[in-house]
From Swiss-Prot:
GO terms for biological process: glutamyl-tRNA aminoacylation. Binds 1 zinc ion per subunit. This is Glutamate--tRNA ligase. The keyword GTP-binding does not apply. Its cofactor is Zn(2+). It catalyses: tRNA(Glu) + L-glutamate + ATP = L-glutamyl-tRNA(Glu) + AMP + diphosphate. Its main location: cytoplasm. Catalyzes the attachment of glutamate to tRNA(Glu) in a two-step reaction: glutamate is first activated by ATP to form Glu-AMP and then transferred to the acceptor end of tRNA(Glu). Monomer. It comes from Shewanella halifaxensis (strain HAW-EB4). HAMAP family: Glu_tRNA_synth_type1 (MF_00022). ATP binds at K239.
Length: 469
């Protein structure tokens, strides 16, 4: 049997981290078993579903590289199929028309609550013949009243619900539109879904959906209900904890691999291993190893992973993601070094691509002023001689290579009989405008000869004016 899973978000908002983790687990289970992964947009809530939210979900999935084999399917384009099945169920007697008014239902629930009873439909119309009338009605599924629904959940083990506790679910509203719980069942059947991976908030829907599947003579898939994600304070995850849309993580400078690695470990583990490539995830992932307990979101851990991936991944690949941030910060990269070279130079310290982009600006454009603290410390009168000498040595270089630049700095320090820092630090501030950068020789090499000469001249003038003032 071919394993077939699905991710079925509702387009009422962005793709948040909880949804992304569910999608990842579902995707990994399919990929680990040479199966298929389906993307389905559950947009039956027409009032709350928006094209913008749908586009954001697709963009998030694509950015995470969670590719799908089928879809995206849209429930709103399948209403004819749902209505066909509803008509079939009415004819077979597994569903019925309910003419109870909203007022009657509300009164019934109030009485049940007052008596301490479970609030559920009392079956008033369950065994009545359909009326030849224009009265409004809903269609309800005729849920079994005896026995129980039992299923073995990959995460939670054996789960059982007594049928006597289950309502006769509404499967079509008064205006004729099918309901979420019904559409899900028909979709999973038609699409051949063999395993449903979703959040634990859907556990109570599962017995109802299983009963509908059995009434249709359809196979029942396996289930895996994953725990919710909490904030690091144990409260439900919210925006203040980092419960933002997936694309916000892109905007904040995270690599998709870092976010995926973080999400896969947020409830699943393989020994003590922390860092997983996508291939390792596929190799080791198992639904049965997902933790039952809720997991706490820790932004610091995500940042640590992101820093690791920026440092360890191919600079060309990191540069392909950095391009977006350079454009977002209005840094024109057409006049400067290759972006991959900048990544190699700056990746050791960068925590995010956003940070890396901001710290790379001096490679591509001139700065207006020297950083005050760095200038006060390193662009003093004693810097005038080393800056003047290194400028002449750099100007005399026939080849602008790392080795030649390094030798020029060494020769300057030797001739002046000073330590390398007495040359390197003023030179760094002169060329970058700040006191922090990669190795000075590498920095100069990437900035380029013409820019270096121009900036050193500017620094010499700055020091001279400071001395004379």
């Amino acid at each position: 049997m071919t394993i077939k899973t699905r991710f079925a978000p509702s387009p009422t908002g962005f793709l948040h981290v909880g949804g992304a983790r569910t999608a990842l687990y579902s995707w990994l289970y399919a990929r680990a078993n040479q199966g298929e992964f389906v993307l389905r947009i559950e947009d039956t809530d027409i009032e709350r579903s928006t094209p913008e939210a749908c586009a954001a979900i697709l963009e998030g999935m694509e950015w995470l590289n969670l590719n799908w084999d089928e879809g995206p399917y849209y429930q709103t384009k399948r209403f004819d199929r749902y209505n066909e099945i509803i008509a079939q169920m009415l004819e077979q007697g597994t569903a019925y028309k309910c003419y109870c008014s909203r007022e009657r239902i509300e009164t019934m629930r109030e009485e049940q609550a007052a008596n301490g009873e479970q609030q559920k439909y009392d079956g008033c119309c369950r065994d009545k013949a359909p009326r030849d009338t224009d009265e409004p009605f809903v269609v309800r599924f005729k849920n079994p009243t005896e026995g129980s629904v039992v299923f073995d959940d990959h995460v939670r083990g054996r789960i059982e619900f007594a049928n006597s506790t289950l309502d006769d679910l509404i499967i079509a509203r008064t205006e004729g539109t099918p309901t979420y719980n019904f559409c899900v069942v028909v979709d999973d059947w038609d699409m051949g879904i063999t395993c449903v991976v979703r959040g634990e908030d859907h556990i109570n829907n599962t017995p109802r959906q299983i009963n509908i599947l059995k009434a249709l003579g359809a196979p029942v898939p396996e289930y895996a209900h994953v725990a919710m994600i909490l904030g690091d304070d144990g409260a439900k995850l919210s925006k203040r904890h980092g419960a933002v849309g997936v694309m916000q993580y892109r905007d904040d400078g995270f690599l998709p691999e870092a976010l995926l690695n973080y999400l896969v470990r947020l409830g699943w583990s393989h020994g003590d291993q922390e860092v997983f490539s996508i291939e390792e995830m596929k190799q080791f992932f198992s639904l049965d190893d997902i933790n039952k307990a809720a997991s706490a979101f820790n932004t610091d851990k995500l940042i640590w992973l992101n820093q690791h991936y920026i440092k360890e991944m191919d600079p060309e690949y990191v540069a392909s993601h950095l391009e977006w941030h350079m454009a977002d910060q209005n840094i024109d990269t057409s006049n400067g070094p290759k972006l991959s070279e900048v990544v190699s130079a700056l990746s050791e310290r960068a925590k995010t691509l956003k940070e890396l982009a901001a710290s790379s600006r001096y490679f591509f454009e001139d700065f207006a002023e020297f950083e005050e603290t760095a200038a006060k410390k390193h662009l003093r009168g004693v810097a005038l001689e080393p800056l003047t000498l290194i400028q002449s040595k750099l100007a005399a270089l026939n080849e602008w290579t790392l080795e030649a630049i390094h030798q020029a700095i060494e020769d300057t320090a030797s001739e002046l009989d000073v330590g390398m820092g007495k040359v390197g630090m003023p030179l760094r501030v002169a060329v970058t405008g700040a006191g922090m950068s990669p190795a000075v020789d590498l920095t100069l090499f990437l900035v380029g000869k013409a820019r270096c000469e121009q900036r050193i001249s500017k620094a010499i003038e700055f020091v001279a004016n400071r001395v004379n003032s």
